[in-house]
């Protein structure tokens, strides 16, 4: 049996009856295995005129006849042609019907969790509120994945597509951000868990960056806001910069200052004296029970409790005055007079004075005659030197130019002078 498949396009069906019959006959003749039965079916189509439709039900032979039905044999032939047409597009028809059925079912049985993949703000807010109220969806804090609260919860087709898109987007974002940032899960940081060596390395790198940032922030703190130890070291350096001869440098450390000053102890300040002489508030109770070593302060503490013995008074000038009233005073030496210089000193002192060169006498500032300073004169008082007057060329006396002499006269004069020299040697 030969299967006939003809593409019935609108352009093909719009032809006349005679033209349609001719084209069908040509098509049947081109078949490798011609069939006589098929030829009879095609030739029978030329007998009837299909006015209503191309292959319509109402077939009329003559214009006067009304409603004449075709024979069963012709209807069977028409069904065969339609089946041959449908077999060619069976897959396309089934695919279209399945898509229509799926879309129809989606409109009726919508998704349980409401994920429609839209990026609208209201839709996302509605989805989040709905999932939060009913408890259908939640995120695991450990795996960071979406989980279902109920075991019997079903996931629709849209949920699968949305979840797949979300995973792909998340993987792309991780690959993109891996070179820029290092993200560490919060539960790993709190519990101290490290799943892999890669996460451990990332965590150590993040800690190093955090410490470096803290150090940078500490360097930014002004000197007035730093620890009191640093301020105390600076005060010590400021107090000893004159005595030790060191230049004042505010960042001079305690160890360097101690080495440069020759290990001199710093002067006790008010704060240190208070902490040394009295008990600190942070002193534990065990230290209070044990006896403390003897110190200089013990005598000071005992003084208010017991009366002090009478101490001998220091010697004063009045004691000598009392003794002088009862004892006669010795003869006091005479004051120096002018006659002492007249007495001749011994010979040794005279020789020593002769050997010493006389010292130059120093003049006082008021005794030295200062050279008088030159008195400043005004510009109008100074006698200006007369400037030479410029003479014009016509007024200037022109000097007489020397006359030019001929060469012959000069030679004769020279010769006469030479002969005169020879004659009168």
Curated annotation (Swiss-Prot):
It comes from Homo sapiens (Human). Pfam families: NPIP. Residues 332-414 are annotated as: Disordered. Residues 401-414 have a biased composition (Basic residues). It comes from the Eukaryota. The gene is NPIPB6. Belongs to the NPIP family. Residues 353-395 have a biased composition (Basic and acidic residues). This is Nuclear pore complex-interacting protein family member B6. PANTHER family: NUCLEAR PORE COMPLEX INTERACTING PROTEIN, NUCLEAR PORE COMPLEX-INTERACTING PROTEIN FAMILY MEMBER B15-RELATED.
